[in-house]
């Protein structure tokens, strides 16, 4: 990806946030990385400066809690179980799209 506006992180984040119920995304160690010193090896999640560095891309997503099912209407007991499959598919689409984009 383009390391400024169309970085790999921003394109993945944009696509992941399109999934209903997603509230956050972090790459690599996420906010735990702020606790490391400069000499420690950070786990950056396979992305450096917005471009894939060849390591596996890893991220964590936060999903909002399931709404109460006490009311009337249609409810999912837990839609969070479907999120990993959808997130994997969305990630594959973003990576495939980037692989077809001319450099």
What do these predicted regions represent?
Residues 57-103:
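Internal helix-turn-beta structural module
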Residues 1-71:
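Glycine-rich anion/phosphate-binding loop at the beta-strand->alpha-helix junction
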